[in-house]
Amino acid sequence: MKKITISDLNNWKEVGEKFASITAYDASFAKIFEEQSMPVIIVGDSLGSVIQGKPTTLDVSIEELVYHTKCVRAGSPNAFIISDLPFMSYHTPEAACGSAAKLMKAGANMVKIEGGSWLINTVKMLTERAVPVCAHLGLMPQAVNIYGGYKLQGKTEEQATKMLENAKELQRAGAQALILECIPAKLARQITLELHIPVIGIGAGNDTDGQVLVMHDILGISANYIPRFSRNFLAETGSIEAAVKKYIDEVKQQTFPGEKHCF
């Protein structure tokens, strides 16, 4: 696999070529994903749940994200790596810059932050300092205590309008990609069409530019349960390599996610 850059993601959006992405946390799995030509890997604070066994992502530290980013980069030298900024590591623009610098030095190509218009100045500052930003809207796991659980977002017209406005504001501020999580497929389609940056969905329908799933979910090894929007590809194929390839192929062909995986 050739080295993937933000230019590739932009080109895929322009020509309408769908792409898959997946979470990873260690070199061994990252190597398998690279061998199957997985173009984008997300080193997520979801490691708090699937690696550390905690009920939320809130306790994950920047040092842990740095460690896992280094591990993933060692296993996948060519994938485009997006690393999460964990809870309260970007509460001010200055704090975000310090945290992001650590992830970029560890091998990330882009950092991801959860939040809407309050992050405008942070996105501007990071972008001006050569740190590419992936915004994250919809269900934001770091805000679980605000929601009272992991719930579908953007259900009302007011919520949908605000989310679209936030997406456009973050794009204007310099965000170069966007993740939409657990929102109605119709809203995700509208946001994807109205933005010029790549939009990656998880539980956001079939019309986003890319898809992402947690690796533990597609391999059927999640500690708790597999979300409605995911699928156990390993059970269908019998090997990790075949499961990953099937996931990549079905995203490209737009056969996954199917209607039953959407809201």
Swiss-Prot record:
Lineage, broadest ranks: Bacteria, Pseudomonadati, Pseudomonadota, Gammaproteobacteria, Vibrionales
Subunit (UniProt): Homodecamer; pentamer of dimers.
Cited SUPFAM superfamilies: Phosphoenolpyruvate/pyruvate domain
Reaction equations catalysed: 3-methyl-2-oxobutanoate + (6R)-5,10-methylene-5,6,7,8-tetrahydrofolate + H2O = 2-dehydropantoate + (6S)-5,6,7,8-tetrahydrofolate
Cofactor field: Mg(2+)
Any one GO cellular component localisation term in the record: cytoplasm
Pathway assigned to this chain's UniProt record: Cofactor biosynthesis; (R)-pantothenate biosynthesis; (R)-pantoate from 3-methyl-2-oxobutanoate: step 1/2
Superkingdom classification of source: Bacteria
EC number: 2.1.2.11
Cystine crosslinks: none
Protein name: 3-methyl-2-oxobutanoate hydroxymethyltransferase 2
Intracellular or extracellular location(s): Cytoplasm
PANTHER family the record matches: 3-METHYL-2-OXOBUTANOATE HYDROXYMETHYLTRANSFERASE (PTHR20881:SF0)
CDD domains, sorted: KPHMT-like
UniProt keywords, alphabetically: Cytoplasm, Magnesium, Metal-binding, Pantothenate biosynthesis, Transferase
Top EC group: transferase
Family (UniProt): Belongs to the PanB family.
Any single biological process term in GO: pantothenate biosynthetic process
Pfam families reported in the protein's UniProt record: Pantoate_transf
Active site positions, chain numbering: E181 (proton acceptor)
Molecular function terms, GO-annotated: 3-methyl-2-oxobutanoate hydroxymethyltransferase activity; magnesium ion binding
Residues that coordinate or bind Mg(2+): D45, D84, E114
Chief location bin: cytoplasm
Record text on cofactor binding: Binds 1 Mg(2+) ion per subunit.
Residues noted as binding 3-methyl-2-oxobutanoate in the record, renumbered to the chain: D45, S46, D84, K112
Known role: Catalyzes the reversible reaction in which hydroxymethyl group from 5,10-methylenetetrahydrofolate is transferred onto alpha-ketoisovalerate to form ketopantoate.
